[in-house]
Amino acid sequence: MPDLLIELFSEEIPARMQARAREDLKKLVTDGLVEAGLTYASAGAFSTPRRLVLSVEGLSAESPTLREERKGPKADAPAAAIEGFLRSTGLTRDRLETREDKKGAVLFAVVEKPGRPAPEIVAEVLERTIRTFPWPKSMRWGTGSLRWVRPLQSILCLLSDEGGAEVVPMTLDGLTAGNSTEGHRFMAPARFAVSGFEDYRAKLGRAFVMLDASEREQAIWHEATTQAFAQGLEVVPDAALLSEVAGLVEWPVVLMGAIGEDFLGLPPEVLQTSMREHQKFFSVTNPATGRIEKFVTVANRETADHGETILKGNGKVLSARLSDARFFWENDLRTVKTAGLEGMAEGLKQVTFHNRLGSQADRIARIEALAREIAPLVGASPDLAAEAARVAKADLQSAMVGEFPELQGTMGSYYARAAGLPEAVAQACKAHYQPLGPSDAVPTDPVSVAVALADKIDTLAGFWRIGEKPTGSKDPFALRRAALGVIRLLLTNNSRAGLMGIMLPAMNRHLEPFDTSDFTPYERELLSFFHDRLKVHLREQGIRHDVIDACLAMPGNDDLTLLVKRAEALSAFLKTDDGTNLLQGFKRANNILTQAEAKDGVEYSFGADPKFAETDAERALFAALETAEAAIGPALQAEDFAAAMSAMAALRAPIDAFFETVQVNADNAVLRRNRLNMLHSIRATCARVADLTRIEG
């Protein structure tokens, strides 16, 4: 079975597009081959800045012959019907078969579609793939109609086996497929022929091209950390930058340079961001001082002077970039010292947050008031929380954040310290944006928590108020992320703040003049939205959706910390034998009771009387229910849900014995009513802990 090698050679492909392009090439080609009837053993996709490559092993040499039988009209059907059948099959009358079935003689057409050779199918699939390739952006060049991310220069398409290799014949917009490629643009630009994937990969290596992006990443990181270690330094990890740089070079050459002394006083985040965004440099720190003192750059070629000229040029460009950063830093510090952070924030009055939600200054005023209300609920000083909220977004007007928006919050914390504000306020300037995602750090300082909650809840309340809610996959204002942030802030800090109590004042601050709206529906919708995000969060931790629903049905479900404690205890309980068996007993009791109440048109909730107990099983269940009630109440009061579940578990054996020996629907009406009331007691006792009717199974 032959192996297939495809290389699409072009001008430089943007690094950010390469990983997706590899997967798209693999999927489009292999899916197309399979749809055409070919099979294969394995496939792998690779990329460098100038080439997309696909290797398919164990490809079948041709597609199978397909035989299709189609049933037609009766043999004595009108001529028009038979003619229509012939047209649909492409056969003549003499090629039809006549077979007997229950309805008599029927015409059948047997259509055989011969297999096609692999080269023909590959050419067809590859042309379709190239013409329909889903680049985020593409271009045309010259006079052709072909579109590609950058001008496509050559196509290598080769089928090879033990007998040799053959070029797949195809021509596309003047490009004819061949068996040759180029090496490194500068170090080995000559073309060379290949006979298969292993030969291709080996010759590329000798031509200074490292084909596998993951190998380039490993080589870059290994060499960078080795050079840093030799000087007692450490490279700051940056997985995204490493992936991007690996997509910029075919033959990585790691070089380390020094940062000018004039710039070492800049905040490390500024140095790292400037070097990463503008130069694609890695930052290198001195563990002894904690400062970023050097940088690592990755060249795409070896040079006779071992990179000295490259480092010199990079150093000049870096100095210019860092001079700009230093200017921004010093200019911002002067503003802070003369006008303070609140003075810096004055410009936010002219910055629109949303045309229906006011300016950034309006938003800050709402967050300040809300942070003051939330502060006591999370153990923070109301005055400090209000002060932090007032200045937390001041750095949005700074020159540094204007140049590097990703430093918002970080620069605010530096400027707050420069202004002499309390450390809790400085920390809140940075931390109030967190958490930004499911794995981001969660603030724990009370002032930071208060401002972070106020920021996110104001955003949610505002957009909910104006009807800008997430729909399907669309969430332009990142409201799902904001809701998850609120959830993680409350849970991580074990906060007992009730969402309903926070959301109402947040909604009220979005009142427009003469607005008399009832916010209750908005609050309930928003609380339901929080519950949906909480379900996703807890499912990722292994808690089933029905367990969460059983706890959501209980009072106080806007206290997320209490809700999660209950869900965790119930989840653990249901994984035990006692939990599983009690659930079955509860469901049996609930089903019998529900059916009886529907049939009789009454509710059996008047309390069972022990004096009507006729059997030991009934008397034992009475005693067990009394004991459970006495234990569950204090346990729930203490929020010890594990103890409440344990008390509920003690009902398992008495309930089992009751159903084994007692007929609930007795002929005696008094006994029947008493026993149904007892089933209600079982349901009511369990319902104090969780709504078990929502549990599946």
Swiss-Prot record:
- Tell me one GO molecular function of this protein: glycine-tRNA ligase activity
Does the record's keyword annotation contain Cytoplasm? yes
Provide the E.C. number(s) assigned to this enzyme: 6.1.1.14
Any one GO CC term of the record: cytosol
Q: Quote the catalytic activity from the record.
A: tRNA(Gly) + glycine + ATP = glycyl-tRNA(Gly) + AMP + diphosphate
Question: What is one Gene Ontology biological process annotated in the Swiss-Prot or TrEMBL record?
Answer: arginyl-tRNA aminoacylation
- Could you list this entry's UniProt keywords, alphabetically sorted: Aminoacyl-tRNA synthetase, ATP-binding, Cytoplasm, Ligase, Nucleotide-binding, Protein biosynthesis
Q: Where in the cell is it found?
A: Cytoplasm
> Family, per the entry?
Belongs to the class-II aminoacyl-tRNA synthetase family.
Q: How does it assemble?
A: Tetramer of two alpha and two beta subunits.
Quote the protein name from its UniProt record.
Answer: Glycine--tRNA ligase beta subunit
Provide the species name.
Answer: Cereibacter sphaeroides (strain ATCC 17029 / ATH 2.4.9) (Rhodobacter sphaeroides)
Q: Which gene encodes it?
A: glyS
